[in-house]
Amino acid sequence: MTAVADAPQAELEGVSSPRAVVVGIMAGEGVQIGVLLDANAPVSVMTDPLLKVVNSRLRELGESTLEAAGRGRWALCLIDGSPLRATQSLTEQDVYDGDRLWIRFIPDTEHRSQVIEHISTAVASNLSKRFASIDPVVAVQVGAGMVGTGVILASGVLGWWRWHHNTWLTTIFASVIAVLVLMVAMMLLMRATTDADRRVADIMLVSGLAPLTVAAASAPPGSVGSPQAVLGFGVLSIAAALALRFTGRRLAIYTAIVTICGLTTLASLSRMVAATSAVTLFATMLLICVVMYHASPALSRRLSGIRLPVFPSATSRWVFEARPDLPTTVAVAAGGPPVLEGPASVRDVVLQAERARSFLSGLLVGLGVLMVVSLTSLCNPHTSERWLPLMLAGFTSGFLMLRGRSYVDRWQSITLAVTAVIVVAAVSVRYALVLSSPLSVSIVASLLVLLPAAGMTAAAVVPNTIYSPLFRKFVEWTEYLCLMPIFPLAFWLMNVYAAIRYR
Protein backbone atom coordinates (compact mmCIF):
# COMPACT_ATOMS: atom_id res chain seq x y z
CA MET A 1 0.00 0.00 0.00
CA THR A 2 1.43 3.37 -1.01
CA ALA A 3 0.44 6.94 -0.31
CA VAL A 4 0.10 9.54 -3.02
CA ALA A 5 2.40 12.47 -2.43
CA ASP A 6 2.13 15.87 -4.00
CA ALA A 7 4.85 16.74 -6.48
CA PRO A 8 7.46 18.97 -4.92
CA GLN A 9 7.24 22.60 -5.87
CA ALA A 10 9.79 23.90 -8.30
CA GLU A 11 12.64 25.73 -6.77
CA LEU A 12 12.50 29.46 -7.07
CA GLU A 13 15.46 31.33 -8.30
CA GLY A 14 17.81 32.06 -5.44
CA VAL A 15 15.73 30.15 -2.92
CA SER A 16 16.41 26.47 -2.07
CA SER A 17 13.36 24.54 -0.86
CA PRO A 18 13.74 21.35 1.20
CA ARG A 19 13.55 18.12 -0.69
CA ALA A 20 10.95 15.49 0.20
CA VAL A 21 10.92 11.77 -0.53
CA VAL A 22 8.09 9.28 -0.62
CA VAL A 23 9.09 6.01 1.06
CA GLY A 24 7.23 2.90 2.12
CA ILE A 25 7.36 2.11 5.85
CA MET A 26 7.08 -1.61 6.76
CA ALA A 27 5.13 -2.02 10.01
CA GLY A 28 3.06 -4.77 11.60
CA GLU A 29 2.30 -8.04 9.84
CA GLY A 30 3.02 -7.35 6.17
CA VAL A 31 1.67 -3.79 6.22
CA GLN A 32 3.34 -1.11 4.10
CA ILE A 33 2.44 2.54 4.70
CA GLY A 34 3.49 5.26 2.28
CA VAL A 35 4.66 8.47 3.90
CA LEU A 36 6.25 11.73 2.82
CA LEU A 37 9.46 12.50 4.70
CA ASP A 38 11.91 15.39 4.71
CA ALA A 39 15.03 14.30 2.89
CA ASN A 40 17.34 16.89 4.49
CA ALA A 41 16.29 16.58 8.18
CA PRO A 42 18.13 14.22 10.56
CA VAL A 43 16.50 10.83 11.02
CA SER A 44 16.30 11.27 14.82
CA VAL A 45 13.99 14.28 14.39
CA MET A 46 11.46 12.30 12.32
CA THR A 47 11.42 8.99 14.24
CA ASP A 48 8.96 9.82 17.05
CA PRO A 49 6.42 11.71 14.87
CA LEU A 50 6.65 8.93 12.30
CA LEU A 51 5.88 6.32 15.00
CA LYS A 52 2.70 8.20 15.96
CA VAL A 53 1.59 8.44 12.33
CA VAL A 54 2.23 4.74 11.74
CA ASN A 55 0.33 3.69 14.88
CA SER A 56 -2.66 5.86 13.96
CA ARG A 57 -2.73 4.33 10.48
CA LEU A 58 -2.49 0.81 11.95
CA ARG A 59 -5.48 1.55 14.18
CA GLU A 60 -7.46 2.64 11.14
CA LEU A 61 -6.59 -0.63 9.43
CA GLY A 62 -7.50 -2.70 12.50
CA GLU A 63 -3.96 -3.92 13.06
CA SER A 64 -2.05 -4.08 16.34
CA THR A 65 0.03 -1.01 17.09
CA LEU A 66 3.77 -0.94 17.63
CA GLU A 67 4.69 -1.15 21.32
CA ALA A 68 8.06 -0.89 23.01
CA ALA A 69 9.30 -4.05 24.70
CA GLY A 70 11.56 -3.16 27.59
CA ARG A 71 14.38 -0.66 27.42
CA GLY A 72 15.58 0.50 24.00
CA ARG A 73 14.83 2.92 21.15
CA TRP A 74 12.88 3.15 17.92
CA ALA A 75 14.91 3.36 14.72
CA LEU A 76 14.39 3.55 10.97
CA CYS A 77 16.13 0.65 9.29
CA LEU A 78 16.81 -0.50 5.79
CA ILE A 79 14.92 -3.48 4.52
CA ASP A 80 17.79 -5.75 5.56
CA GLY A 81 17.46 -4.56 9.18
CA SER A 82 20.51 -2.32 9.42
CA PRO A 83 19.54 0.91 11.21
CA LEU A 84 20.01 4.31 9.65
CA ARG A 85 22.30 6.81 11.31
CA ALA A 86 20.21 9.04 13.54
CA THR A 87 22.33 12.16 12.99
CA GLN A 88 22.30 12.05 9.18
CA SER A 89 19.52 12.78 6.73
CA LEU A 90 17.92 10.42 4.24
CA THR A 91 19.76 12.06 1.33
CA GLU A 92 23.13 11.56 3.01
CA GLN A 93 22.32 7.87 3.43
CA ASP A 94 21.17 7.42 -0.21
CA VAL A 95 17.46 6.98 0.49
CA TYR A 96 15.30 8.16 -2.44
CA ASP A 97 11.71 8.00 -3.69
CA GLY A 98 10.26 4.53 -3.79
CA ASP A 99 12.66 3.00 -1.25
CA ARG A 100 11.26 0.87 1.55
CA LEU A 101 12.24 1.38 5.18
CA TRP A 102 11.48 -0.56 8.33
CA ILE A 103 10.63 1.03 11.68
CA ARG A 104 11.45 -1.31 14.52
CA PHE A 105 12.34 -1.34 18.21
CA ILE A 106 16.00 -2.01 18.97
CA PRO A 107 16.55 -3.34 22.53
CA ASP A 108 19.22 -1.70 24.62
CA THR A 109 22.09 -4.14 25.13
CA GLU A 110 23.91 -1.97 27.65
CA HIS A 111 23.58 -2.79 31.36
CA ARG A 112 22.73 0.23 33.51
CA SER A 113 23.28 0.29 37.24
CA GLN A 114 22.28 2.91 39.76
CA VAL A 115 25.03 5.32 40.74
CA ILE A 116 25.49 5.20 44.52
CA GLU A 117 27.01 8.39 45.85
CA HIS A 118 26.41 7.94 49.60
CA ILE A 119 26.06 5.06 52.07
CA SER A 120 22.44 6.01 52.78
CA THR A 121 21.67 5.62 49.08
CA ALA A 122 23.27 2.17 49.10
CA VAL A 123 21.20 1.07 52.09
CA ALA A 124 17.98 2.32 50.52
CA SER A 125 18.83 0.68 47.20
CA ASN A 126 19.53 -2.72 48.76
CA LEU A 127 16.47 -2.59 51.00
CA SER A 128 14.22 -1.73 48.06
CA LYS A 129 15.39 -4.92 46.34
CA ARG A 130 14.56 -7.15 49.32
CA PHE A 131 11.39 -5.60 50.69
CA ALA A 132 8.23 -4.48 48.94
CA SER A 133 7.25 -0.85 49.05
CA ILE A 134 4.06 0.51 50.56
CA ASP A 135 1.21 0.24 48.08
CA PRO A 136 -2.30 1.72 48.44
CA VAL A 137 -3.74 -1.58 49.71
CA VAL A 138 -1.20 -1.91 52.53
CA ALA A 139 -1.55 1.79 53.35
CA VAL A 140 -5.30 1.41 53.85
CA GLN A 141 -4.78 -1.63 56.08
CA VAL A 142 -2.23 0.23 58.19
CA GLY A 143 -4.64 3.12 58.53
CA ALA A 144 -7.44 0.78 59.57
CA GLY A 145 -5.13 -0.80 62.15
CA MET A 146 -4.29 2.63 63.56
CA VAL A 147 -7.98 3.51 63.80
CA GLY A 148 -8.73 0.19 65.52
CA THR A 149 -5.90 0.71 67.98
CA GLY A 150 -7.16 4.19 68.79
CA VAL A 151 -10.70 2.91 69.32
CA ILE A 152 -9.48 0.17 71.70
CA LEU A 153 -7.32 2.63 73.65
CA ALA A 154 -10.22 5.07 73.90
CA SER A 155 -12.42 2.25 75.20
CA GLY A 156 -9.80 1.42 77.82
CA VAL A 157 -9.63 5.04 78.97
CA LEU A 158 -13.42 5.22 79.23
CA GLY A 159 -13.51 1.96 81.16
CA TRP A 160 -10.89 3.26 83.57
CA TRP A 161 -12.98 6.39 84.13
CA ARG A 162 -16.09 4.28 84.84
CA TRP A 163 -14.11 2.18 87.33
CA HIS A 164 -13.35 5.27 89.44
CA HIS A 165 -16.43 7.44 88.75
CA ASN A 166 -20.09 6.45 88.73
CA THR A 167 -21.18 8.70 85.85
CA TRP A 168 -22.93 8.36 82.49
CA LEU A 169 -20.00 9.83 80.58
CA THR A 170 -18.54 6.44 79.71
CA THR A 171 -21.86 5.01 78.54
CA ILE A 172 -22.72 7.93 76.25
CA PHE A 173 -19.23 8.40 74.82
CA ALA A 174 -18.60 4.67 74.25
CA SER A 175 -22.04 4.24 72.65
CA VAL A 176 -21.35 7.01 70.14
CA ILE A 177 -17.94 5.55 69.25
CA ALA A 178 -19.39 2.04 68.91
CA VAL A 179 -22.22 3.19 66.63
CA LEU A 180 -19.87 5.15 64.36
CA VAL A 181 -17.25 2.40 64.08
CA LEU A 182 -19.81 -0.36 63.50
CA MET A 183 -21.60 1.71 60.85
CA VAL A 184 -18.31 2.24 59.01
CA ALA A 185 -17.55 -1.48 59.29
CA MET A 186 -20.96 -2.40 57.86
CA MET A 187 -20.52 0.00 54.94
CA LEU A 188 -17.09 -1.44 54.19
CA LEU A 189 -18.44 -4.99 54.35
CA MET A 190 -21.27 -4.22 51.94
CA ARG A 191 -18.94 -2.54 49.43
CA ALA A 192 -16.03 -4.97 49.77
CA THR A 193 -15.08 -6.78 46.57
CA THR A 194 -11.58 -8.09 47.35
CA ASP A 195 -9.91 -9.86 50.26
CA ALA A 196 -8.01 -6.68 51.13
CA ASP A 197 -11.27 -4.73 51.43
CA ARG A 198 -12.79 -7.43 53.62
CA ARG A 199 -9.68 -7.45 55.81
CA VAL A 200 -10.04 -3.72 56.44
CA ALA A 201 -13.73 -4.17 57.26
CA ASP A 202 -12.94 -7.01 59.67
CA ILE A 203 -10.38 -4.84 61.47
CA MET A 204 -12.97 -2.12 61.96
CA LEU A 205 -15.61 -4.63 63.05
CA VAL A 206 -13.40 -6.29 65.67
CA SER A 207 -12.28 -2.93 67.05
CA GLY A 208 -15.90 -1.78 67.25
CA LEU A 209 -16.67 -4.56 69.74
CA ALA A 210 -14.51 -2.87 72.42
CA PRO A 211 -16.54 0.36 72.84
CA LEU A 212 -19.75 -1.65 72.55
CA THR A 213 -18.66 -3.81 75.49
CA VAL A 214 -17.60 -0.80 77.57
CA ALA A 215 -20.89 0.97 76.86
CA ALA A 216 -22.93 -2.06 77.90
CA ALA A 217 -20.85 -2.76 81.02
CA SER A 218 -21.00 0.84 82.24
CA ALA A 219 -24.78 1.14 81.84
CA PRO A 220 -25.86 -0.39 85.21
CA PRO A 221 -25.50 2.19 88.02
CA GLY A 222 -23.38 1.62 91.09
CA SER A 223 -19.85 0.46 91.65
CA VAL A 224 -18.34 -1.95 89.14
CA GLY A 225 -19.17 -5.55 90.02
CA SER A 226 -20.88 -8.68 88.78
CA PRO A 227 -23.92 -6.92 87.18
CA GLN A 228 -21.63 -4.86 84.99
CA ALA A 229 -19.62 -7.97 84.11
CA VAL A 230 -22.76 -9.91 83.17
CA LEU A 231 -24.01 -7.20 80.84
CA GLY A 232 -20.62 -6.37 79.33
CA PHE A 233 -19.43 -9.92 78.62
CA GLY A 234 -22.93 -10.98 77.58
CA VAL A 235 -23.20 -8.24 74.97
CA LEU A 236 -19.69 -8.99 73.72
CA SER A 237 -20.42 -12.71 73.34
CA ILE A 238 -23.67 -12.01 71.46
CA ALA A 239 -21.99 -9.45 69.18
CA ALA A 240 -19.12 -11.85 68.41
CA ALA A 241 -21.59 -14.66 67.68
CA LEU A 242 -23.53 -12.42 65.28
CA ALA A 243 -20.32 -11.35 63.53
CA LEU A 244 -19.31 -15.00 63.25
CA ARG A 245 -22.70 -15.94 61.82
CA PHE A 246 -23.10 -13.19 59.24
CA THR A 247 -19.51 -12.66 58.07
CA GLY A 248 -18.24 -16.23 58.06
CA ARG A 249 -14.64 -15.06 58.46
CA ARG A 250 -12.13 -14.85 61.31
CA LEU A 251 -13.70 -17.97 62.80
CA ALA A 252 -10.90 -18.61 65.27
CA ILE A 253 -10.96 -15.06 66.67
CA TYR A 254 -14.71 -14.92 67.12
CA THR A 255 -14.83 -18.45 68.55
CA ALA A 256 -12.22 -17.56 71.15
CA ILE A 257 -14.15 -14.39 72.09
CA VAL A 258 -17.44 -16.28 72.38
CA THR A 259 -15.82 -19.02 74.50
CA ILE A 260 -14.18 -16.61 76.94
CA CYS A 261 -17.11 -14.22 77.22
CA GLY A 262 -19.78 -16.92 77.38
CA LEU A 263 -18.21 -18.76 80.31
CA THR A 264 -17.31 -15.48 82.03
CA THR A 265 -20.93 -14.33 81.69
CA LEU A 266 -22.17 -17.51 83.36
CA ALA A 267 -19.66 -17.11 86.19
CA SER A 268 -20.63 -13.45 86.70
CA LEU A 269 -24.31 -14.38 86.68
CA SER A 270 -23.68 -17.01 89.34
CA ARG A 271 -21.79 -14.45 91.40
CA MET A 272 -24.60 -11.90 91.04
CA VAL A 273 -27.51 -14.25 91.78
CA ALA A 274 -26.09 -16.75 94.28
CA ALA A 275 -23.12 -14.78 95.69
CA THR A 276 -20.81 -17.66 94.80
CA SER A 277 -17.33 -17.42 96.26
CA ALA A 278 -14.35 -16.69 94.05
CA VAL A 279 -12.70 -20.05 94.82
CA THR A 280 -15.82 -21.94 93.79
CA LEU A 281 -16.18 -19.91 90.61
CA PHE A 282 -12.58 -20.37 89.47
CA ALA A 283 -12.52 -24.06 90.40
CA THR A 284 -15.77 -24.66 88.54
CA MET A 285 -14.42 -22.76 85.56
CA LEU A 286 -11.35 -24.98 85.63
CA LEU A 287 -13.44 -28.17 85.60
CA ILE A 288 -15.63 -26.86 82.77
CA CYS A 289 -12.52 -26.10 80.73
CA VAL A 290 -11.16 -29.61 81.29
CA VAL A 291 -14.44 -31.12 80.11
CA MET A 292 -14.52 -28.82 77.09
CA TYR A 293 -10.98 -29.82 76.16
CA HIS A 294 -12.32 -33.34 75.66
CA ALA A 295 -15.46 -32.18 73.85
CA SER A 296 -13.88 -29.49 71.66
CA PRO A 297 -13.13 -31.76 68.63
CA ALA A 298 -16.72 -33.02 68.51
CA LEU A 299 -18.06 -29.51 69.10
CA SER A 300 -15.97 -28.02 66.30
CA ARG A 301 -17.12 -30.81 63.97
CA ARG A 302 -20.75 -30.02 64.70
CA LEU A 303 -20.22 -26.28 64.26
CA SER A 304 -18.62 -26.83 60.85
CA GLY A 305 -21.46 -29.08 59.64
CA ILE A 306 -19.47 -32.29 59.19
CA ARG A 307 -21.67 -35.37 59.58
CA LEU A 308 -20.24 -38.66 60.73
CA PRO A 309 -20.96 -41.81 58.71
CA VAL A 310 -23.51 -44.32 59.96
CA PHE A 311 -22.02 -47.55 61.25
CA PRO A 312 -23.67 -50.90 60.40
CA SER A 313 -26.42 -51.94 62.76
CA ALA A 314 -27.17 -55.31 64.29
CA THR A 315 -29.80 -55.91 61.60
CA SER A 316 -27.09 -55.77 58.89
CA ARG A 317 -28.60 -52.63 57.39
CA TRP A 318 -26.12 -50.43 55.50
CA VAL A 319 -23.42 -53.09 55.66
CA PHE A 320 -22.81 -52.98 51.91
CA GLU A 321 -24.12 -49.48 51.20
CA ALA A 322 -23.52 -45.98 52.48
CA ARG A 323 -26.01 -43.67 54.07
CA PRO A 324 -28.47 -42.37 51.45
CA ASP A 325 -27.58 -38.70 51.96
CA LEU A 326 -23.81 -39.22 51.59
CA PRO A 327 -22.02 -38.95 48.21
CA THR A 328 -20.71 -42.24 46.87
CA THR A 329 -19.54 -41.82 43.26
CA VAL A 330 -16.77 -39.58 42.02
CA ALA A 331 -17.69 -37.63 38.88
CA VAL A 332 -15.25 -35.57 36.83
CA ALA A 333 -16.70 -32.98 34.46
CA ALA A 334 -14.90 -31.86 31.33
CA GLY A 335 -12.16 -29.52 32.50
CA GLY A 336 -13.61 -29.28 36.01
CA PRO A 337 -12.54 -30.48 39.45
CA PRO A 338 -13.62 -33.93 40.69
CA VAL A 339 -16.85 -33.88 42.67
CA LEU A 340 -18.92 -36.45 44.50
CA GLU A 341 -22.39 -37.15 43.22
CA GLY A 342 -24.73 -36.25 46.01
CA PRO A 343 -25.43 -33.29 48.28
CA ALA A 344 -21.76 -32.84 49.23
CA SER A 345 -18.74 -32.32 47.04
CA VAL A 346 -15.01 -32.56 47.52
CA ARG A 347 -14.75 -28.78 47.80
CA ASP A 348 -17.48 -28.71 50.45
CA VAL A 349 -15.68 -31.35 52.49
CA VAL A 350 -12.40 -29.42 52.30
CA LEU A 351 -14.18 -26.19 53.29
CA GLN A 352 -15.91 -27.87 56.23
CA ALA A 353 -12.61 -29.36 57.40
CA GLU A 354 -10.96 -25.93 57.31
CA ARG A 355 -13.88 -24.41 59.23
CA ALA A 356 -13.62 -27.18 61.83
CA ARG A 357 -9.90 -26.44 62.21
CA SER A 358 -10.63 -22.74 62.76
CA PHE A 359 -13.36 -23.48 65.30
CA LEU A 360 -11.09 -25.89 67.18
CA SER A 361 -8.21 -23.39 67.23
CA GLY A 362 -10.50 -20.70 68.65
CA LEU A 363 -11.83 -23.06 71.30
CA LEU A 364 -8.33 -24.04 72.41
CA VAL A 365 -7.20 -20.42 72.64
CA GLY A 366 -10.28 -19.38 74.61
CA LEU A 367 -10.04 -22.32 76.99
CA GLY A 368 -6.33 -21.65 77.46
CA VAL A 369 -6.99 -18.06 78.53
CA LEU A 370 -9.62 -19.20 81.01
CA MET A 371 -7.30 -21.89 82.40
CA VAL A 372 -4.47 -19.41 82.97
CA VAL A 373 -6.74 -16.91 84.71
CA SER A 374 -8.47 -19.54 86.86
CA LEU A 375 -5.33 -21.31 88.06
CA THR A 376 -3.47 -18.06 88.71
CA SER A 377 -6.39 -16.77 90.76
CA LEU A 378 -6.68 -20.01 92.76
CA CYS A 379 -3.00 -20.11 93.74
CA ASN A 380 -3.10 -17.67 96.65
CA PRO A 381 0.14 -17.69 98.69
CA HIS A 382 -1.63 -16.47 101.87
CA THR A 383 -4.11 -19.36 102.23
CA SER A 384 -3.64 -22.05 104.85
CA GLU A 385 -3.54 -24.89 102.30
CA ARG A 386 -1.42 -23.27 99.64
CA TRP A 387 -0.09 -26.64 98.48
CA LEU A 388 -3.53 -27.73 97.26
CA PRO A 389 -3.93 -25.22 94.39
CA LEU A 390 -0.24 -25.69 93.54
CA MET A 391 -0.80 -29.41 93.06
CA LEU A 392 -3.90 -28.64 91.01
CA ALA A 393 -1.91 -26.28 88.78
CA GLY A 394 0.90 -28.81 88.38
CA PHE A 395 -1.37 -31.70 87.37
CA THR A 396 -3.32 -29.43 85.01
CA SER A 397 -0.14 -28.22 83.32
CA GLY A 398 1.07 -31.77 82.87
CA PHE A 399 -2.27 -32.80 81.40
CA LEU A 400 -2.23 -29.92 78.92
CA MET A 401 1.39 -30.54 77.92
CA LEU A 402 0.78 -34.23 77.20
CA ARG A 403 -2.63 -33.57 75.67
CA GLY A 404 -1.06 -31.50 72.91
CA ARG A 405 0.51 -34.57 71.27
CA SER A 406 -2.94 -35.84 70.19
CA TYR A 407 -3.55 -32.91 67.81
CA VAL A 408 -2.47 -33.14 64.18
CA ASP A 409 -2.29 -29.40 63.57
CA ARG A 410 0.98 -28.10 64.99
CA TRP A 411 -0.47 -24.71 65.95
CA GLN A 412 -3.09 -26.42 68.08
CA SER A 413 -0.41 -28.53 69.77
CA ILE A 414 1.66 -25.40 70.33
CA THR A 415 -1.40 -23.68 71.85
CA LEU A 416 -1.78 -26.38 74.50
CA ALA A 417 1.95 -26.48 75.24
CA VAL A 418 2.12 -22.69 75.57
CA THR A 419 -0.92 -22.73 77.85
CA ALA A 420 0.78 -25.24 80.15
CA VAL A 421 3.97 -23.19 80.30
CA ILE A 422 2.12 -19.90 80.89
CA VAL A 423 0.19 -21.46 83.79
CA VAL A 424 3.42 -22.39 85.56
CA ALA A 425 5.01 -19.02 84.80
CA ALA A 426 1.98 -16.99 85.93
CA VAL A 427 1.62 -18.89 89.20
CA SER A 428 5.34 -18.53 89.90
CA VAL A 429 5.33 -14.81 89.20
CA ARG A 430 2.34 -14.32 91.48
CA TYR A 431 4.11 -16.11 94.33
CA ALA A 432 7.22 -13.98 93.82
CA LEU A 433 5.25 -10.72 93.76
CA VAL A 434 3.01 -11.53 96.72
CA LEU A 435 5.57 -13.14 99.06
CA SER A 436 8.38 -10.69 98.14
CA SER A 437 11.05 -12.73 99.91
CA PRO A 438 14.60 -13.52 98.72
CA LEU A 439 13.87 -17.26 98.73
CA SER A 440 10.70 -16.98 96.65
CA VAL A 441 12.29 -14.60 94.16
CA SER A 442 15.32 -16.90 93.75
CA ILE A 443 13.17 -19.99 93.23
CA VAL A 444 10.89 -18.25 90.74
CA ALA A 445 13.79 -16.76 88.78
CA SER A 446 15.46 -20.18 88.54
CA LEU A 447 12.19 -21.79 87.51
CA LEU A 448 11.54 -19.19 84.80
CA VAL A 449 14.95 -19.92 83.28
CA LEU A 450 15.06 -23.71 83.70
CA LEU A 451 11.53 -24.36 82.43
CA PRO A 452 12.08 -22.88 78.92
CA ALA A 453 15.50 -24.55 78.80
CA ALA A 454 13.89 -27.92 79.49
CA GLY A 455 11.30 -27.20 76.82
CA MET A 456 13.98 -26.33 74.28
CA THR A 457 15.86 -29.54 75.11
CA ALA A 458 12.70 -31.58 74.69
CA ALA A 459 11.94 -29.84 71.38
CA ALA A 460 15.41 -30.75 70.10
CA VAL A 461 15.35 -34.38 71.29
CA VAL A 462 11.76 -35.63 71.07
CA PRO A 463 11.04 -35.12 67.32
CA ASN A 464 14.33 -36.79 66.33
CA THR A 465 13.83 -39.90 68.44
CA ILE A 466 11.84 -43.02 67.61
CA TYR A 467 10.08 -44.39 70.68
CA SER A 468 8.78 -47.87 71.25
CA PRO A 469 5.06 -48.59 71.56
CA LEU A 470 5.56 -49.38 75.25
CA PHE A 471 7.04 -45.93 75.89
CA ARG A 472 4.19 -44.29 73.96
CA LYS A 473 1.71 -46.20 76.09
CA PHE A 474 3.56 -45.06 79.22
CA VAL A 475 3.23 -41.41 78.10
CA GLU A 476 -0.48 -41.94 77.52
CA TRP A 477 -0.88 -43.43 81.01
CA THR A 478 1.01 -40.44 82.42
CA GLU A 479 -1.53 -38.14 80.79
CA TYR A 480 -4.35 -40.07 82.42
CA LEU A 481 -2.56 -39.96 85.77
CA CYS A 482 -2.32 -36.16 85.47
CA LEU A 483 -5.99 -35.95 84.54
CA MET A 484 -7.34 -38.14 87.35
CA PRO A 485 -6.47 -35.92 90.36
CA ILE A 486 -7.85 -32.70 88.83
CA PHE A 487 -11.49 -33.27 89.77
CA PRO A 488 -10.82 -34.58 93.33
CA LEU A 489 -8.41 -31.72 94.07
CA ALA A 490 -10.88 -29.15 92.70
CA PHE A 491 -13.70 -30.58 94.84
CA TRP A 492 -11.38 -30.54 97.85
CA LEU A 493 -10.51 -26.91 97.15
CA MET A 494 -14.22 -26.00 96.94
CA ASN A 495 -14.87 -27.74 100.31
CA VAL A 496 -17.29 -30.17 98.68
CA TYR A 497 -16.08 -33.05 100.87
CA ALA A 498 -16.52 -30.99 104.05
CA ALA A 499 -20.03 -30.04 103.00
CA ILE A 500 -20.91 -33.68 102.37
CA ARG A 501 -19.36 -34.76 105.66
CA TYR A 502 -21.11 -32.21 107.87
CA ARG A 503 -24.42 -32.18 106.06
Curated annotation (Swiss-Prot):
GO terms for cellular component: plasma membrane. The keyword Transmembrane helix applies. Keywords: Cell inner membrane, Cell membrane, Membrane, Transmembrane, Transmembrane helix, Transport. The chain crosses the membrane at residues 137-157, 169-189, 200-220, 224-244, 250-270, 272-292, 359-379, 414-434, 443-463, 480-500. It is found in: Cell inner membrane. It comes from the Bacteria. Its main location: membrane. It is a multi-pass membrane protein. InterPro entries: EccD_transm, T7SS_EccD, YukD-like. Pfam families: EccD, YukD. Part of the ESX-5 specialized secretion system, which is responsible for the secretion of EsxN and a number of PE_PGRS and PPE proteins. This component is essential for ESX-5 complex stability and secretion. Belongs to the EccD/Snm4 family. Part of the ESX-5 / type VII secretion system (T7SS), which is composed of cytosolic and membrane components. The ESX-5 membrane complex is composed of EccB5, EccC5, EccD5 and EccE5. This is ESX-5 secretion system protein EccD5. It comes from Mycobacterium marinum (strain ATCC BAA-535 / M). The lineage of its organism: Bacteria, Bacillati, Actinomycetota, Actinomycetes, Mycobacteriales.
